[in-house]
Amino acid sequence: MLLSTVAFAMANVFVKLVSHLPAMEIVMFRCLVGTAFCFYGLRKANAGWRGSNRKSLLLRGIFGTTALYFFFVTVRNIPLASAMTIQYLSPIFTTIIAIFLLKETVKPLQWLFYAIAFSGVLFIERFDARVSIFFLIIGIFSAFCSGVAYNLVRSLREREHPLTVVLHFQIVGLVAGFIFTLFEWQIPSGWDWIYLFLIGAFSQLGQIFLTAALQKEKAASVAIINYSGLIYGLFFGWLIFNESQQLESLAGMILVVVGVVLSVIYSRRQSEIEKIEATGG
């Protein structure tokens, strides 16, 4: 699982290293590499790529691409660790949106944990002059779109091959990126080409390691360890981009992680209790 967090953090580092390129151009190259990996994986698994739930797959691709685009915008314009922290709100939106899409319920105590997490975001915006309200809203919107995309993935998990779902996200991102890039194309130079490839490669590696961890470990444990990525974000931000953090901003990041982690732990325990009660245990 730690390999997954390192891989995703490295992908974010390379996004920031090519921040002089248009965000949609970065999306296009990221999805180009991802599409190649997915087709290879599907061919190896002897699975079809078209899918049978076209509407849900398309919507998953649209919301996933939108989330990715706005996340890249935040990474380009605010400190790396701050952008990653705001994106960590996505599980909260996933749970809230599931109330409407999947008819799931949220316990009262979970709302308290969500409030703790959002208060952390306000801390970051209030005490870090590099994080404007504009990019804060963009980051939150990215997390919201991720929440919608995750719910669509959950609705498809019993009906489509996982790589088919991922592939449609990559294809939508590739097509959208190509269209937008026609109007704002900027030729990458030198190391840019390598960085763009590594964005896609590390993102795909992160997904592979994450999937492997979910298959071997409890989902709650994986979710909690995933937030250790913030440590790598802080370290790489300081080492490569000379991004220091005030104590107040660090406190805000901790509040976000604590709020989300407590929500994950509580939700998993409630699910286990409900299963025991359902079986009469």
Language-model-detected regions and their locations in the chain:
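C-terminal-most transmembrane helix of multi-pass membrane proteins
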Residues: I231-G281
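Helix-helix packing/entry segments at the starts of transmembrane helices
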Residues: A83-L89, L156-I171, Q207-W238
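Membrane-interface interhelical linkers
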Residues: M1-V6, T35-L59, P108, E158, ...
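Loop-to-transmembrane alpha-helix entry segments
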Residues: Q87, K103-F123, A129, I133-L136, ...
